[in-house]
């Protein structure tokens, strides 16, 4: 079965989609968020649609450049640019956490320049949660309180009588199912003869983040059946790559890699394994919110967690073996200090393990395709 | 090699720094008139004596503790140790050494440290990569920026130095102060375990008391800076920042500020301006050019432009009550730590920062703001335009934005700075 013009997968190429329109027609709210370090199940239990902010398709950042200097992340700038042009006017709420210096400042810029701009009259509630930068018991207690406060703020802002434990448990079930389905699809790409490409897998992940999870689960089940019955992809003449680093919500980039003689057999991305690797463990059924918070806090981290580099390295080592990769492609969006330094350490650590590594920097939009292609092709040839 | 030499070789950059300080002070003594640039004359002398004593202590074998500039140095006085500020080492050597710190930046860049990360850390990292620093432990808050969070793990994972991370919340509420107080206490206890020392609370209190007094004096100095013309030279800004970093919590810092207060009072009384005539009063809400602090003197003398203060000088916190119980003391330390230069602005939302700037502009009769946006400081990368609009709307004064690297002249040179500011000043006069 061809997934070329699949309706679900095509959601990944736009921001707004028919599912969001249907959702809002029935007077339900959409809350935008930047980073996977938020308790999505809590929003779901509040009958809100969590929508991960991205800038898919954005080519310019000239409006956002007025407010953000050129040393900031071009992905975040592109999202602001899109928002300044009205691309996020459909949001009914906005949740920011201190994931990184770039996205954290969107709390103020959206407040002042997007939601308060002329002729935009909708009142959009904004929420902020502060996440510790280390993984400790005290840090968890802090974050738990933050999430509990967020729950109260959501109830107040959207006049919800109570986000009950029953609702939270139901959301946990739906989200765990969602992550399980994504892991199943991931397994199909890990195979020696994979059923889908890395670019297709990225499409699935992006689409999954943009629609209600109940529908997404149905779609993912359908995709799994379709993939299983599909002919395997011949990647025998390609090099298997583990793609690591900054956010990738742009298919141009993964296609560029896969058109250069590589197959993205696995990843360590937030539109990838970092999102679905860990489930909520129902250790304490009386406090589902605590279980949700534990998953977010203790899950496989991104480099914004300062003391967790070795666990990330272990994850890479496991994934290198599981996906039988020939090399690791580390990438960062320019000005991302977090991924830049984590990748610096990975480069040396992986070289010591004799794993071929390429460490590249790029802009969010594909402004330097030839340079990237040359470097990636040279790397592929080398391994 | 003797133990003394071996021990001393743990802080070779401090030896280089001391030599640079000695040479600088010799030049000051020989070239400048007796009353010229008192902050530099007095400040370098005080810093020099303390650095010399640190080198001796390191040679005796005391533990060398690396720390982040935003971890108040007086808190480390609870240990018998040699505190080494990583960021200040990079930047003060950038300003004092003839070739700056660029060799060490390049070394780290070659090792894979991204070009857009902070040179204040890059320099010290390069020195450490070359084994010029050997720390017994390093302590840092998990703030104020991504560069800190991203760069410090290098010391742990590449060089195997014990790294104590003191988690600092990105939120200013009462619960944040309590949380950070606990973090500070457990961080210091953890550091003590690593170096095999108990916390000496008596010494800690003494150091805090000294800084309480320094804070009070700085308040007085800042009240005098409100006068037109400003009675203090521009170089006071970097020198007092350096004084805090290198001699904070010590009697030398107190005597430096006492002497500066007397000089400031005298100039205020005589309506004297260091540069001769004050033509423009500027506030630098962010950083100065650490790769060349002599820009400050040039602005004073050549343009009559006063730099009333920069980010490292305008943060004041409540005095810490050292007569209370330990929990209260740690709470006070937490509040000071969270109100520290750059930490405060980075872990709060923009509104308080912009409001402070507006009120500073009014209180200090500023004619303009000069906002230097350093390549590393992403947490400040979204504020310039908002601040510019607010200053024009609320106070009617302009703001010049200059993008640069605070510790590396190769990005925006001193010449470019001078040209940009000269043209800007022409539009004001």
Placement of each model-derived feature along the sequence:
Chain B
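Redox- and metal-dependent alpha/beta enzyme cores, enriched for Fe-S-associated oxidoreductases
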Residues: 69-70, 75-105, 283-358, 362
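Peripheral docking tails and interdomain loops at the edges
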Residues: 385-429
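Proline-aspartate-enriched helix->loop->beta-strand connector
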Residues: 135, 361-370
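Short Gly/Thr/Asp-enriched flexible loops that form oxyanion-binding sites at enzyme active sites
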Residues: 150-154, 379-389
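Internal, well-ordered alpha/beta segment that forms a basic, Gly-enriched binding/recognition surface
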Residues: 118-120, 127-224
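A short, acidic, amphipathic alpha-helical segment used as a generic capping/interface helix at domain edges
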Residues: 124-127, 348-365, 382-386
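Generic N-terminal leader/targeting and pre-domain segments
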Residues: 18-26, 34-135
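A charged, amphipathic alpha-helical module
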Residues: 2-63, 189-320, 346
